C-alpha cells in the first residue's frame, strides 16, 4: 500500500510538472518561458508579417526578445529551417519618432548590445545563425517568427 501511494504521488508530481509547458501551445508552435513561437517559411514585408501574426492567435505579434536566452531559443528554431537568413522581429520605428518599440508593447530592456543608429530604415530583422540585428527597410520581404503568450 505504501509503495502504491509513493508511486501515485510520483506520477502526480510528473504530471503537474509537465502541465503548463508545450501543452499550452497549439500544434506546430514551440513553447518557451510561457510564450509560444512559430517560424513561418514565407516572406512578407514587416507590416504584412505583423498583421499575419495578429491573425494567427489572440495576442500574437512578431517575435520580441526579453533576454539573450530567449533570443538563443529563437535562433535554435530558425537556424535549422531557414539556414542563414534574416527574420523580422517586432522591433520597429514605423512611426518615425526615433524611438524603437516592440509591436507587442513590451519594454525594450534587451537590446543584444545593439547600438541603434537612426536612419531612413525603420524595422529590425535578426540573423537566423547568430541573432545579429540589422535595421532594414520595412518593405523588404523577409521570413518571420510569430509569438504569443500561452
Swiss-Prot record:
Q: Where mainly located?
A: secreted
Tell me which Pfam families the record gives: Lectin_C (PF00059)
Disulfide linkages recorded for this protein, renumbered to the chain, are 25-36, 53-146, 123-138
Q: Which InterPro entries match?
A: C-type_lectin-like, C-type_lectin-like/link_sf, C-type_lectin/snaclec_domain, CTDL_fold
Q: Which SUPFAM superfamilies match?
A: C-type lectin-like (SSF56436)
Q: Name one GO cellular component term.
A: extracellular region
Q: Name one GO molecular function term.
A: toxin activity
The entry's note on the tissues where this protein occurs is:
Expressed by the venom gland.
Q: Where in the cell is it found?
A: Secreted
Q: Which UniProt keywords apply?
A: Blood coagulation cascade inhibiting toxin, Disulfide bond, Hemostasis impairing toxin, Platelet aggregation inhibiting toxin, Secreted, Signal, Toxin
The signal sequence is 1-23
Q: Where is the C-type lectin domain?
A: 32-147
How the protein assembles, per its UniProt entry? Answer: Heterodimer of subunits alpha and beta; disulfide-linked.
Write out the function statement from the record.
This potent antithrombotic agent acts in a calcium-independent manner. Exerts its anticoagulant effect by two distinct mechanisms. It binds to activated thrombin through exosite 1, blocking fibrinogen clotting, platelet activation, factor V activation and other effects, and it interacts with prothrombin (F2), decreasing its proteolytic activation -especially in the presence of factor Va. In vivo, intravenous injection before thrombosis induction causes a significant decrease in thrombus weight.
Instruction: Give the protein family.
Output: Belongs to the snaclec family.
Give the protein name, as stated in the record: Snaclec bothrojaracin subunit beta
Species of origin reads Bothrops jararaca (Jararaca)
